Structure formats: structure tokens, C-alpha cells
């Protein structure tokens, strides 16, 4: 007899466990395949719950995606408040939340309308980290430029390293981001 995921992992019980399992499964699957390629049934199966529970707790797949993005963004903002304004702290936040950045990139590419109206506290946290004491358009411009560099690297870095035959490690990336961030 083969072991199934449900035989190995107990099914979640109660509202809090079910919601947490659905969000964790959505986070993993959305980061892996993007919003267009993931179904409610995929998420429910990975969470070990009936797909009707996804609808009960989140309404629609789109609302689940928005919830995952909003909650991960809030977690990043909380973590950012404990960091200094250095490049290492900024990059550590990226390393600690890779699924969020992949979901964000995939959502921007696949279904940008899903981001309309989603509160993203991580954006304000990055404005503070990158822009520092500066306020207004220039701090936000620097943040957008640094964000584009880093998110672009997350999405295309491996491919670009192969194409241009260069091996860029975390330290080299930190130096490159540091140059952009410090050019404020």
C-alpha cells in the first residue's frame, strides 16, 4: 500500500488550522507555478482539505491570492522595521521571503489586475529602508529602481548568469544593490 500525503501528514482541523494550511499551500504553489496555472483544487489538495473550504474561507481564488500577498507583505514590513538601513538587511529580507517575491513577480506578469487595491506594506517598508530620511518622489524613485534591480535578479538572475557567462554570488549582488541604493 502506498503512503499518501494525507497518511503522512494529518489533515488540518478547525478554522485556524484549515486557513493556515490553505495559505501555506497557496504560497508554495503560487510561487512555483503562478496564479494562472494554480487551481483551487490544487491548493486544496496540497493543504489536505476539501476545495469547498477554500471558497468558504476566502471566497475566490483571486481573494486567496490577494490575502497571501497582503499577509506576506505585512510579515516583510514587520521584519523590515527591525533592520538597519544597510544593503545586507535589505537582501536578508529578500532571502527570508523568496516565495513572496516569486508570487509577486508571477502575478505582475500573469495577472496584474489581481494587485489592484491590495495593501502592500512591504513597499512602504522598502521606501523607508532604501529612501531613508528622504521623503517624496526621490525616495520612491530610488526604491523603485532598487526594487526593479533586485526583483529582476530574482526572476532572471540565473538565466542572465548563464547567458553572459558570469557567476554572481550573494556578495556581488549585495555590492551591486548597494551601489544603486547608495546613489540616492
Task: List each model region and its residues.
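C-terminal peripheral helix-coil segments that are non-catalytic and often amphipathic
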Residues: 1-9, 92, 127-135, 155-184
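Amphipathic alpha-helical interaction segments
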Residues: 21, 63, 103, 141-148
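Amphipathic alpha-helical packing segments from all-alpha helical-bundle domains
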Residues: 77-81, 111-144, 175
Amino acid at each position: 500500500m502506498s503512503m499518501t500525503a494525507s497518511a503522512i501528514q494529518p489533515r488540518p482541523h478547525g478554522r485556524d488550522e484549515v486557513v493556515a494550511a490553505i495559505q501555506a499551500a497557496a504560497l508554495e504553489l503560487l510561487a512555483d507555478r503562478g496564479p494562472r496555472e494554480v487551481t483551487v483544487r490544487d491548493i486544496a489538495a496540497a493543504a489536505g482539505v476539501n476545495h469547498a473550504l477554500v471558497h468558504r474561507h476566502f471566497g475566490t481564488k483571486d481573494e486567496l491570492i490577494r490575502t497571501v500577498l497582503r499577509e506576506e507583505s505585512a510579515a516583510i514590513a514587520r521584519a523590515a522595521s527591525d533592520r538597519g538601513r544597510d544593503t545586507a538587511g535589505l537582501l536578508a529580507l529578500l532571502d527570508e521571503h523568496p516565495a513572496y517575491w516569486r508570487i509577486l513577480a508571477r502575478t505582475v506578469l500573469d495577472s496584474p489586475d489581481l494587485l489592484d487595491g491590495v495593501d502592500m506594506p512591504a513597499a512602504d517598508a522598502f521606501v523607508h529602508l532604501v529612501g531613508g530620511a528622504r521623503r517624496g518622489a526621490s525616495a520612491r524613485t530610488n526604491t523603485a529602481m532598487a526594487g526593479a534591480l533586485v526583483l529582476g535578479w530574482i526572476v532572471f538572475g540565473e538565466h542572465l548568469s548563464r547567458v553572459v557567462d558570469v557567476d554572481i554570488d550573494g556578495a556581488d549582488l549585495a555590492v551591486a544593490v548597494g551601489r544603486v541604493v547608495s546613489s540616492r
